[in-house]
Amino acid sequence: MSTIIDVYAREVLDSRGNPTVEVEVYTEGGAFGRALVPSGASTGEYEAVELRDGDKSRYLGKGVLNAVKNVNEIIAPEIVGFDVTDQAGIDRAMIELDGTPNKGKLGANAILGVSMAVAHAAADFVGLPLYRYLGGFNAKQLPTPMMNIINGGSHADNNVDFQEFMILPVGAPTFKESIRMGAEVFHALKAVLHDKGLNTAVGDEGGFAPNLGSNREALEVIIEAIEKAGYKAGEDVFLGMDVASSEFYNKETGKYDLSGEGRSMTSAEMVDFYEELCKDFPIISIEDGLDENDWDGHKLLTERLGKKVQLVGDDLFVTNTKKLAEGIEKGISNSILIKVNQIGTLTETFEAIEMAKRAGYTAVVSHRSGETEDATIADIAVATNAGQIKTGSMSRTDRIAKYNQLLRIEDELGEIAVYDGLKSFYNLKK
């Protein structure tokens, strides 16, 4: 009854109007699972390969018909007959079938679609919510949201260098209240920007994308919005930044070209800059503060700020246990961003989260800039008790879908639901 009898993929669209892969899995007993694969704008060079067709006559070369074909003609025959609850076995079979270190043959978008759809079908088969199926009865922690309310960098068409400026409503007693706080600050920010005569259009992840004079000014207007909403910055709400510095790192000069600031900085100068910002603003999290290959710079940043600021490796670690193990060994950063499509299977995703926790690193489950209505990452965050989630702003249905799923989960958990807020940053000295 739990045997997989059919796997089917199709080409659908993501939140940017670009093609992506959707996969459906069916079992002998009638269980069903469906999953859609996200896509990133700023991608690390060590990420698993997202297979695109390259045919300029279709979707500007971004079609995924080859990935769809790989599911339907190569992966499906391999996993039909598997028990749907054998997640690790199915993921391992697909990894071996691909045979490359970066899933470049079949495509991480093909493999991940199947991996997630299998999990959904298995949860349907056993009659459990996905978070409970994946995490067991210990799955009860709702994540602290990192809400991206100002977009810059490659996520927006403006002159702000840093890619994301986030609010973290750590002072809320429940996840439900954290969402309310975030929404109120978001709407207050819209009013602040409007009063300043600034653009209130939103970027890929639902945050505003105004032309501001500097990265510092972005932090200043967020503080103003927090206060306008009736909250205290540094108490109720903290700040976070995804710098995505690889996007403006100049490999030829070895410097960081911040066009919005009108400056080029060395690694040491960037660390000085972050230290200065952290003194002036209640910043609790910095992601990809230096280039993914600037390990010496990351080491310096960790030495200077690692005890009081969460330093998240995204492009640095790419949800890869080998990269993370190297970072842990060298004492670089203290947190990892978890993106399922960076590594390509749920099994490997869970292994990365487990490795991080064993080493005392935090794990932040994350969306991508090209998202869909699929809310699997919400269930993953609760299943693993990750403690933090980064899934965009308080606008755009592709972002809100994850928050709404978490609200449902909190409601379902009832009295056993846990929202740790500031405690989810367990490796920082408060």
UniProtKB/Swiss-Prot annotation:
GO cellular component, one term: phosphopyruvate hydratase complex
Residues annotated for Mg(2+) binding in this entry: D242, E287, D314
Family: Belongs to the enolase family.
GO biological process: glycolytic process
Location(s), subcellular: Cytoplasm; Secreted; Cell surface
Organism phylogeny: Bacteria, Bacillati, Bacillota, Bacilli, Bacillales
Function, in words: Catalyzes the reversible conversion of 2-phosphoglycerate (2-PG) into phosphoenolpyruvate (PEP). It is essential for the degradation of carbohydrates via glycolysis.
Positions with a binding annotation for (2R)-2-phosphoglycerate: Q163, K339, R368, S369, K390
Keywords: Cytoplasm, Glycolysis, Lyase, Magnesium, Metal-binding, Secreted
Disulfide bonds: none
Family matches, as NCBIfam families: eno (TIGR01060)
Annotated transmembrane regions: none
A single MF term (Gene Ontology): phosphopyruvate hydratase activity
Cofactor binding annotation: Binds a second Mg(2+) ion via substrate during catalysis.
Protein name as catalogued: Enolase
Catalytic activity: (2R)-2-phosphoglycerate = phosphoenolpyruvate + H2O
InterPro entries in the record: Enolase, Enolase-like_C_sf, Enolase-like_N, Enolase_C, Enolase_CS, Enolase_N
Reported cofactor(s): Mg(2+)
Entries under Pfam families matching the protein: Enolase_C (PF00113), Enolase_N (PF03952)
Active site, UniProt feature: E205 (proton donor), K339 (proton acceptor)
EC number of the protein: 4.2.1.11
Pathway(s) the chain acts in: Carbohydrate degradation; glycolysis; pyruvate from D-glyceraldehyde 3-phosphate: step 4/5
